[in-house]
């Protein structure tokens, strides 16, 4: 060994910059460096070490000299030191042996860096964040974790955690040039380790940030990221194969929307994999939709203010337990849709906001970068790396969790620059308009990428305006979504039902108007969580009248939804008419169905169960949802009696007549025109006793005769009980 005094010293300014984590190239100081053709220097910093030795590849052991500030160094033989290990003698007597974190090449290649800066890296989670990695060296395999983070405005970045006493001086990262990415491979750190990134700004501030790409996070209110790697073995090959060939336009889709923390409070992902899956299967739904399951700091946001886009929330278990839940749904024949929130994110100091001291993920101008109503930041959709972060995140949930659909939240807030903004609070686009052109491009790219890479996966827009082409293909200039929530239908329908039956005749347009635009987009009919919060009450309380009328109203409402063109969605608890408004802080009120007082609620639940079974067995109710040939009115103008009827036509030639009486009077002999003569069989009556109805006028078969009526060549006469709906199947 050569004395350290013969080593050219590192400049004090560099050592100081390293100590305060404001140096871009720690690998240029620490690690192994050639001195001349025969010698090399090994230099390392280990805070709290008493002695450090290096074990060379020829089995030589060399002690490194302490040169101050926890730095140890020695000159060693060049050939024997190309690979080495460090033996660290810590204060207190502990001895550890490890590879040197500063003796490895970058774990990101040039192609990775190019794709990231172009915004085109579709597997971003495999190269950024914390990825457990094994690197093969001359002295054997080295297990550890490759860390990488995008922080282009930082003056220095370090990995911190219990493994270094949360001291950023121990593991500063290197900057990979103009890419803005900082990288470091740390040996002997693996799955389960809590970590953060210490971001140092040019203004001298230190920001301890959770990893934007973390695959697991601590349970809130803790904010650390956790190194994670999946060991889950999927058992849904058949489901995934069949999904790729599914045409959702022409298949049944009945969605049960769920907040996992309140469906039955206290259950984790693994318990829900039995209890929730069994319930959804028993009820006959085709799909379940989770309110956001990405990590979020505030439970009261229901998951819509995301801090960890790649980390399933730890409130209800581990990422692999979530995989188990989704797998269980697939094995039960049920698809899984997840709410996804690319519109905005919270301002919590540990998360994405001002990530490297400046606006990074958010737009730098507050007139585009903040959503004042929600107190959140808005993503900078025009920035390549940000767009890549979001598109890759969509793919991540599809790839890593086998999710079958993404319901994209708050799309309208993305599309319009003046969304919920007063004059002077927004910036127009380059053409002077209010359309957010960058957000449009992002949504088109996301949808095109998802549909190309994962055939059969759905993307569903929550879009509350009349923006054209939401569900039109991107190659036609549309946004490219598979479906769109029909907010207009939902608002008009609930407004109509909120009136006393005697007054509904004055609001008849509310219940018929939806068919004017029913085929302008591909729609989902949503009675979602948004309709049972913020003082709106439950669907039960929004029905007028006493308990009998409320129950009859809900039964009729649900039958109308299932018969109307469009896919169906119902939020948890509404399937049995929960009385109280929903709260994320408590379980559903399953007790509403108990005892004699619960008979109406049990009846509603039975009706929804029967509607799901009937719906799935009736192509007329779903196979032409997006084809005008799948629908015709048979009575749309009887406002005085609050009666509505129409026929749904299946692609297989089947036909179902839907008849609704939204009023309070029975109609024992009501004549309707129909497209076919012969027998029409009653397959559902919401007034039946099994649903706790009055059991009045229960037709089983009705004959249509060759008598012209209302423009049809055939007609029939039906009994229509007050506040009820009936479905009749044509049997020729």
UniProtKB/Swiss-Prot annotation:
SUPFAM superfamilies assigned to the protein according to its UniProt record, in alphabetical order: (Trans)glycosidases, E set domains, Glycosyl hydrolase domain
Catalytic activity, reaction form: Transfers a segment of a (1->4)-alpha-D-glucan chain to a primary hydroxy group in a similar glucan chain
GO molecular function, one term: hydrolase activity, hydrolyzing O-glycosyl compounds
UniProt key word Transferase: yes
Active site: 409 (nucleophile), 462 (proton donor)
InterPro entries recorded: A-amylase/branching_C, Branching_enzy, GlgB, GlgB_N, GlgB_N_E_set_prok, Glyco_hydro_13_cat_dom, Glyco_hydro_13_N, Glyco_hydro_b
GO biological process: glycogen biosynthetic process
GO cellular component, one term: cytosol
Keywords noted in UniProt: Carbohydrate metabolism, Glycogen biosynthesis, Glycogen metabolism, Glycosyltransferase, Transferase
Function: Catalyzes the formation of the alpha-1,6-glucosidic linkages in glycogen by scission of a 1,4-alpha-linked oligosaccharide from growing alpha-1,4-glucan chains and the subsequent attachment of the oligosaccharide to the alpha-1,6 position.
Family per similarity comment: Belongs to the glycosyl hydrolase 13 family. GlgB subfamily.
The protein's assembly and partners: Monomer.
Listed name of the protein: 1,4-alpha-glucan branching enzyme GlgB
Organism phylogeny: Bacteria, Bacillati, Actinomycetota, Actinomycetes, Mycobacteriales
């Amino acid at each position: 060994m050569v004395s350290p005094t013969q080593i050219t010293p590192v400049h004090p300014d560099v050592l100081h910059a390293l100590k305060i984590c404001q140096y871009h190239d720690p690998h240029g100081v620490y690690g192994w460096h050639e001195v001349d053709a025969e010698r090399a220097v090994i230099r390392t910093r280990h805070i709290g070490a008493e002695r450090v030795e290096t074990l060379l590849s020829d089995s030589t052991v060399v002690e490194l000299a302490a040169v101050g500030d926890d730095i140890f160094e020695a000159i060693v033989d060049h050939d024997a030191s190309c690979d080495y290990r460090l033996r660290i003698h810590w204060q207190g007597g502990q001895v550890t042996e490890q590879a040197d974190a500063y003796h490895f090449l970058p774990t990101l290649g040039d192609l990775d860096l190019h794709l990231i800066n172009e915004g085109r890296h579709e597997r971003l989670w495999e190269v950024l964040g914390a990825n457990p990695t094994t690197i093969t060296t001359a002295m054997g395999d080295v297990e550890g974790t490759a860390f990488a983070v995008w922080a282009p405005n930082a003056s220095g970045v370090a990995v911190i955690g219990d493994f270094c006493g949360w001291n950023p001086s121990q593991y500063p990262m290197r900057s990979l040039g103009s890419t803005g990415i900082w990288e470091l491979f740390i040996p002997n750190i693996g799955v389960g380790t809590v970590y953060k990134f210490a971001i140092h700004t040019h203004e001298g501030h230190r920001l301890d940030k959770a990893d934007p790409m973390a695959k697991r996070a601590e349970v809130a209110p803790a904010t650390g990221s956790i190194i994670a790697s999946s060991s889950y073995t999927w058992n849904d090959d058949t489901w995934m194969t069949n999904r790729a060939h599914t045409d959702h336009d022409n298949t049944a889709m009945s969605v049960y929307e769920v907040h996992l923390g309140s469906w039955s409070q206290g259950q984790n992902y693994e318990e829900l994999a039995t209890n929730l899956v069994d319930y959804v299967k028993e009820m006959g739904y085709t799909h379940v939709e989770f309110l956001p399951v990405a990590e979020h700091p505030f439970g009261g946001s229901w998951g819509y203010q995301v801090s960890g886009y790649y980390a399933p929330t730890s409130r209800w278990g581990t990422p692999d337990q979530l995989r188990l839940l989704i797998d269980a749904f697939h094995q039960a024949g049920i698809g899984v849709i997840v709410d996804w929130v690319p519109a905005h994110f919270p301002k919590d100091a540990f998360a994405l906001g001002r990530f490297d001291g400046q606006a990074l993920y958010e737009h730098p101008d507050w007139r585009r970068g903040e959503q004042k109503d929600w107190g959140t930041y808005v993503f900078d959709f025009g920035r390549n790396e940000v767009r890549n972060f979001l598109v890759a995140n969509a793919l991540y949930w599809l790839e890593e969790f086998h999710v079958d659909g993404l319901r994209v939240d708050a799309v309208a807030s993305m599309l319009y620059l003046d969304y919920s903004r007063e004059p002077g609070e927004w910036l127009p686009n380059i053409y002077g308009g209010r359309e957010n052109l960058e957000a449009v491009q992002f949504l088109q790219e996301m949808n095109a990428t998802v549909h190309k890479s994962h055939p059969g996966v759905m993307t569903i827009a929550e879009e509350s305006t009349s923006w054209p082409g939401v569900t039109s293909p991107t190659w036609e200039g549309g946004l490219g979504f598979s479906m769109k929530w029909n907010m207009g239908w939902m608002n008009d329908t609930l407004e109509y039902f909120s009136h006393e039956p005697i007054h509904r005749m004055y609001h008849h347009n509310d219940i018929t108007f939806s068919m004017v635009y029913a085929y302008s987009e591909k729609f989902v009919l949503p009675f979602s969580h948004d309709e049972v919060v913020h003082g709106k009450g439950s669907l039960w309380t929004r029905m007028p009248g006493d308990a009998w009328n409320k129950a009859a109203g809900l039964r009729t409402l649900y039958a109308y939804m299932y018969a109307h063109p469009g896919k169906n969605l119902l939020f948890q608890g509404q399937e049995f008419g929960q009385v109280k408004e929903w709260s994320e802080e408590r379980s559903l009120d399953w007790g509403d169905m108990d005892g004699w007082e619960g008979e109406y609620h049990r009846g509603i639940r039975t009706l929804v169960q029967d509607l799901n079974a009937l719906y799935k067995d009736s192509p007329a109710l779903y196979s032409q949802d997006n084809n005008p040939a799948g629908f015709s009115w048979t009575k749309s103008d009887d406002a005085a009696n609050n009666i509505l009827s129409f026929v749904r036509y299946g692609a297989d030639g089947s036909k179902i007549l839907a008849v609704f009486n939204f009023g309070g009077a029975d109609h024992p002999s009501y004549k309707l025109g129909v497209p076919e003569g012969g027998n029409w069989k009653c397959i559902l009556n919401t007034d039946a006793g099994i649903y706790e109805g009055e059991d009045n006028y229960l037709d089983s078969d009705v004959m249509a005769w060759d008598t012209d009526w209302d423009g049809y060549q055939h007609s029939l006469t039906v009994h229509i009980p007050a506040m009820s709906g009936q479905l009749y199947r044509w049997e020729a």
